[in-house]
Curated annotation (Swiss-Prot):
PANTHER family: MOLYBDATE TRANSPORTER 2, PTHR31970. Disruption phenotype: Resistance to molybdate. The gene is mot-1. This is Molybdate transporter 1. Residues 327-351 have a biased composition (Low complexity). It is a multi-pass membrane protein. It comes from Neurospora crassa (strain ATCC 24698 / 74-OR23-1A / CBS 708.71 / DSM 1257 / FGSC 987). The chain crosses the membrane at residues 24-44, 58-78, 98-118, 137-157, 168-188, 214-234, 287-307, 413-433, 435-455.
Length: 541
């Protein structure tokens, strides 16, 4: 049994141990920031576009962060659904369509988790198509960042016209020049990240020696976000010099007209009944179809397997279901207690190279089993959809990122969730969205670009094997970019994969690889082709 009183008691004790220990608490706080590079860009971009309700998203995602940390006891993140977010930004989808797409995924995941259909999806959908959706979604974010956010800006300033035709002084705080500077910082951050990945294969003594000479790593998205907020505050204060009425909220998003002292989140002011009618919108269905394999394989199966790898039963027995480990002491084991930011185990998988589909058995019996994880994702989206919350899921990449930054318990995401919950509860008025409306598009574009490149890089690096697999991935990603429709890209990738299988069957090819991946070349050609592929170095590796 997973949801048992003794297990929950052990998890609470595990979380409290990390909360009350000063050096472990610092590691948990550091780990909670590890996944902000994905959350902040998409949260800001979707909020400013009017595709989500920002206060509801902060409140519900914070609440789900807290519940996830209490139930699972591991730093399992609550992330945006990236394929839906990318499609929404590229297609300028309204709030109802975006949220309805997340609700459809919630329905599907609930059905799959309740009927045991996750393994069937794992067999039916080839990995190359899933990676193609990742690459296509990532490149869609890059296109949205460059074409919709940075390109309209001026090189040194961006004119801001108000009702009286006067430009605001804040126009100097948003330009392409700022975007170039922010992009330079992003490239430096990527270089430091690559250096850390190279050190993961070195001896522990050499790695600790090099780490001691390096400055403390802070998520670049967090730095850019804080600087952008300061710029936004300055722009808001400067805009008072010339009378200017705030623009209407995009997509007719409701605002709270109550006095400032009553700006506490009220469900009556944030309910969106049109979400249910948008369930029949073909655009929402298309976005959900593209997101479903990504959620099933990466957010459920890969996250479950990765949790078992990062938190093995011999080091973290308190996180496992009641079996032979149920008689273990309530306090965390010494190896778990001594884990900190400076002593991360060298075998920790990186956020770019999780281990999807590596161990289904351990994934079902690990600290994050498949069925509870799928129920968690469906509950998050179905319960929050009427309030316009951003489509949410868990993720293996975010789990690895937070673990790398020092998170070893649910304390990290509980602290992050508490912060988001309080922001959504006490700052739901129009002032918060107005402040974000002054957030420099230069910084936002670079943040979204970084998130898109990171998402695409994961897809590119996880495609291994035959040339046909890469062709399927490119067909999927290219069709997504060409038609600006993730569903069309998914169907194109499946059609390409099916065509290769038919050609292999007609030509007497053999089936090779996990999950039905095909090896369509002969043995000699296959060895020669594989040797050539191994000599190539993927971009940003």
């Amino acid at each position: 049994m997973f949801f048992t009183k003794p297990r929950l008691h052990r998890i609470i004790t595990h979380n409290l141990h990390h909360l009350l220990s000063p050096h472990l608490l610092l590691s948990e706080i550091s780990g909670s920031l590890g996944d902000l590079g994905t959350l902040l860009p998409l949260l800001l971009a979707l909020s400013l576009q009017g595709s989500i309700d920002l206060p509801s998203t902060l409140l519900f995602s914070g609440l789900f962060n807290i519940l996830t940390g209490l139930v699972f006891g591991v730093p399992l993140p609550v992330q945006p659904m990236k394929a839906i977010a990318a499609a929404s930004l590229q297609e300028n989808a309204d709030l109802e369509t975006t949220v309805a797409a997340g609700a459809w995924v919630g329905f599907a995941v609930l059905l799959l988790g309740g009927t045991g259909g996750l393994k069937r999806v794992m067999r039916w959908v080839p990995g190359a198509v899933v990676r193609g959706v990742q690459v296509g979604a990532g490149m869609s974010l890059v296109v949205a960042a460059g074409g919709g956010m940075v390109r309209p800006l001026g090189w040194l300033w961006t004119p801001e016209e108000n009702e009286n035709g006067h430009g605001g002084l804040g126009e100097w705080l948003d330009s392409r020049a700022l975007a170039v500077l922010a992009f330079g910082g992003l490239v430096v951050g990527l270089g430091q990240q690559q250096q850390q990945q190279q050190q993961s294969g070195e001896k522990p003594q050499e790695r600790r020696k090099k780490r001691s000479k390096m400055p403390v790593q802070v998520p670049y998205a967090l730095v850019l976000f804080l600087v952008g907020i300061m710029f936004a505050v300055v722009r808001v204060s400067l805009s008072k010099d010339s009378p200017q009425s705030p623009p209407p909220p995009p997509h007719d998003q409701p605002t709270n007209s109550a006095p400032p002292w009553t700006w506490i989140w009220n469900p009556l002011n944030h309910i969106h009944p049109k979400v249910f009618r948008s369930l029949l919108n073909p655009q929402a269905l298309s976005m959900a179809i593209a997101q479903l394999p990504l959620t099933t394989l990466n957010s459920i199966i890969a996250a479950s397997a990765l949790a078992s790898d990062l938190f093995p039963p011999d080091s973290y027995p308190q996180l496992y279901a009641d079996d032979e480990s149920s008689d273990s002491p309530l306090s965390p084991s010494p190896s778990a207690s001594s884990s900190s930011l400076s002593s991360a185990p060298p075998q920790t998988p990186s956020a770019e190279t999780p281990k999807p589909l590596s161990s289904p058995t351990s994934a079902e019996e690990g600290p994050v089993p498949l069925t509870p994880l799928s129920l968690s994702i469906s509950a998050m989206n179905l319960l929050s959809a009427p309030f316009g919350c951003m489509p949410l899921c868990h993720g293996s990449g975010g789990l690895a990122a937070q673990h790398r930054f020092g998170a070893r318990s649910g304390t990290s995401i509980i602290l992050l969730g508490l912060t988001k919950f309080l922001l959504g509860l006490f700052f739901p008025g129009p002032g918060l969205l107005g402040l974000l409306g002054k957030f420099p598009k230069a910084f936002l574009g670079v943040m979204v670009l970084g998130a898109g490149v990171e998402l695409a890089r994961v897809g590119v690096r996880n495609v291994e094997g035959e040339e046909q697999d890469r062709m399927v991935m490119l067909m999927t990603a290219g069709t997504i970019l060409a038609f600006k429709n993730d569903g069309v890209g998914f169907l194109a990738g499946m059609g390409c994969y099916g065509g290769f299988r038919v050609a292999a069957w007609l030509g007497g090819g053999t089936e090779k690889g996990r999950g039905g991946e095909q090896g369509l070349l002969g043995e000699e050609e296959e060895e020669e082709e594989q040797g050539r592929v191994d000599e190539e170095s993927p971009l940003l590796r």
